Amino acid sequence: MGARLGRRAGPEAGSEAGAAAGCGPAPYERRVRWLREIQSTLRERRPERARQLLRLLRQDLGLERTLLPDILYRDVAFLNPVDPISHDLLVNLARDLQCPKKDYELWKSSDKICRQLIYHLTPHSKQQQGSSLRQRKTQSCLKSSLQKTLLAGETVDLSGIPLSTQDVQHITRYLSSHGAVLAVLDLSFTGLSDELLHLLLPSLWALPRLTQLLLNGNRLTRATARKLTDAIKDTTKFPALAWVDLGNNVDVASLPQPLLVGLRRRLSQRTSLPTIYEGLDLEPEGSAAGATTPASTWDSTAAGLGPEPQACCAR
C-alpha cells in the first residue's frame, strides 16, 4: 500500500539526522529550495536539470516509486495517504516536464505548479513578516492561546510558532487543565522533533474529544509514527482521534496500515477512510503477479532508483 518509507539518496541525505534533531534547516526548507531551483532552471531552458531536481524532490517526499509510465499513460487515482495534495501536484509537474504542451511555454505551466507546491509546503501566512516581528508575534500568540478558556469542540492553533522544551511543558500543563473539550490541535510548522512530541504524547492521548492532530511541516521521523501506531492500538488512548496529519516531515512517507485501521475504528459513523485503499491494484494490466506493492511497507526500505523510462507523449 502506498508510497514507501524509503531512504533518501544523494548529498542531501546526510542532513536528515540534523533536521530531525532540531538543528539545521527544516525538511520543508530543503524541498522549497529544490522547487525554486526547478523554476530557475526552466527559465534558463534546462529541462533535463529540472527533471533531475524533481526526481530528488519525489524521492525526498517518499514518492520515488511513482513511476513515469503510471504518470503518463494511466489515470493515477492512488494518492499518497500522508500528503495527497503534494502528490497530486508532483504528478502534474512530472507530466508537465515529461510531456510539455506544444502550444504553451514549458516554464510557465511548470512554474505555476512549483508556486502551488511552495505555497502548500511552507507556513506561507507566517512568512510575510520580518523575523524579529514574527518572533515577537508568535510568542505573544502562544501566551494568549494558552490563557484562554476553551469551548466544547474548539481548536487550539499553534501553527508557525517555534516551540522550545519549556513551551512544550507549558502546553502539557495547559492540556491537563483545559483539554477536556479540545477537538483539534494544530502544531504544524512548530519545529517539533521526536523528542518534543514524546513529551507531549501522554497529555495528547488522554484528551477525550481530540479528533484531529495536525503535525505537518515539522522534524518528525518514522519513530513518531511508530509511537502513534502503538498508542492507537490501545483503545484507552486517543479515544476520539479520527486523523493525524504527518505530512511534510523528515521521512514519514506513508502511514502504517495499523495506524490507519486504528483511526478507522474510532469513526463509528463511517465505514471507511478515504486514505485506506483496500484491494487497489496499482500495477498495469498484464503485469507479473508477484510484482504488486505489498499492502504494508512499514518495515521495508525502498529499492534503489533505477533509470526511469524517458517516454514522452504529445499534448
From Swiss-Prot:
The organism's place on the tree of life at top rank: Eukaryota
LRR repeats: 182-195, 207-220
Compositionally biased residues, Low complexity: 11-23, 286-297
UniProt keyword terms in alphabetical order: Leucine-rich repeat, Repeat
Region of interest (Disordered), residue spans: 1-23, 284-315
Ranges that cross the membrane: none
Matching InterPro entries: LRR_dom_sf (IPR032675)
Signal peptide interval: none
PANTHER family in UniProt: LEUCINE-RICH REPEAT-CONTAINING PROTEIN 75A-LIKE ISOFORM X1, LEUCINE-RICH REPEAT-CONTAINING PROTEIN 75B
Its job: May suppress myogenic differentiation by modulating MYOG expression and Erk1/2 signaling.
Sequence similarity: Belongs to the LRRC75 family.
Protein name: Leucine-rich repeat-containing protein 75B
Native source organism of the sequence: Homo sapiens
